[in-house]
Structure formats: C-alpha cells, structure tokens
Curated annotation (Swiss-Prot):
Source superkingdom: Bacteria
Protein name: Uracil phosphoribosyltransferase
Species, as recorded: Brucella ovis (strain ATCC 25840 / 63/290 / NCTC 10512)
Keyword Cell membrane carried by entry: no
Cofactor: Mg(2+)
Ways its activity is controlled: Allosterically activated by GTP.
Similarity annotation: Belongs to the UPRTase family.
Length: 208
C-alpha cells in the first residue's frame, strides 16, 4: 500500500516545535493533540460517502454522509493515547481499541499485556496509532493481533518513522498503508529514531 508523508506546512511547523528539547510537557501534549487532528484529516481523506435525504431551512436535498460502520482508532499504549484526543474531536463517533505493548529494552521485542477492541472490528476501518515507527516491532505485533481478530481494512498513523522500521513494516504488512509526518534519518544503537524527538510517552506524561 505504501507510505504517505503528510507535508502540510502546519504539520511540519508543529512537529519542529515538538522536536525541540526545551518544549515543555504541557506544550508537547497540546501540540500532539493539534497535529493528530491534522494527520487524521489526511488518513481519512478517501473514506467512502453515500447520500441521505435531509431538509435544510429552505428545501429538501440529498446530502453526502460517511458510508458504512464507524471507524475504529486502535491505540498502541501508552503513547498512542496522545493521538486519540484530537482524532476523537474530529470523529467523535469512532470506536476505540487499546493494545497494550511495551518494548523490552534488551531485545527490543514487544511484550503484550492488554488487548481490548470492538467485537465487530471485522466490518470496520481500523486506524492504528502510535507516535513512533522505529523498529516497527510493536506496530507489526499490534496489527498481527488485529488481523487475528478479523480486521482486514487497516491503516497505520504515526508522527515519525525510521527507514528501517518502514522496510520491516511494509514487508510484514504490505496491505497496510502508513501515514507519517516525517521519515527521519535512521535508528540509533538503542533503537530510537534520530534525530527524532525523544521518547514520545515520556515527553507527553513528564516521565523518564
């Protein structure tokens, strides 16, 4: 399906402020909400429409509305939750799934500790959200789990991606399109994206 880099000037401007090491936790959290709304606009750009009969104050008309069941936003915990607020502001009727994964700092492999999703996920477009696509191990594991539950229409949304992560992800899930604000230079020896913005979860919640 490929990779879409969202190059909108507002996205790029806000991302630059988020990258700065002196940006406060409060500002980082606010910017993450703002940029997630803009990214959500892009990832939902080609949703299918149908029409419904309505009446305006002047006359009846056939007006466009979204077709099919509501979206599912699937957050990879914990950092993925930072993207949810802005996205739910834009699509308040969306369902939400949570996938609890943490990365073993020695092996860099994901370890699952929680999974909760709508039962009828098979009939819905699922947008998986995580700020970083670094090694891609967590993203691959999350989508493996969603596919096990029957999801077939999946997209992945992140702030930053590493070339190594994109390569691994697209090999594992070639049917899932990736949307990101930036493809950075590389991963460092600890598996972090560089130049990156640090640990998104820590910067969002003020932890280390």
């Amino acid at each position: 399906m490929g990779v879409t880099v969202v190059s909108h000037p507002l996205v790029q401007h806000k991302l630059t402020i988020m990258r700065k090491k002196e940006t406060s936790t409060a500002s980082f959290r606010r910017l993450l909400k703002e940029i997630s709304l803009l990214l959500c606009y892009e990832v939902t750009r080609n949703l299918e429409l149908t029409t419904m009969s309505i009446e305006t104050p002047l006359m009846p008309m056939e007006a466009p509305v979204l077709e099919g069941k509501k979206l599912v936003f699937a957050s990879i915990l914990r950092a993925g939750n930072g993207l949810l607020e802005g996205m739910l502001d834009l699509v308040p009727a969306a369902r939400v799934a949570h996938i609890g994964l943490y990365r073993d700092h020695d092996t860099l492999q994901p370890i699952e500790y929680y999974f909760k999703a709508p039962e009828d996920i098979v009939n819905r477009l699922v947008i998986v959200v995580d700020p970083m696509l670094a090694t891609a191990n967590s993203a691959i594991a999350a989508i493996d789990k969603l596919k096990e539950r029957g999801a077939t229409n999946i997209r992945f949304l992140c702030l930053l991606a590493a070339p190594e992560g994109i390569e691994r992800f697209t090999k594992a899930h070639p049917d899932v399109e990736v949307f990101t604000a930036s493809i950075d230079e590389r991963l460092d020896e600890k598996g972090y994206i560089v130049p990156g913005l640090g640990d998104a979860g820590d910067r969002m919640y003020g932890t280390k």
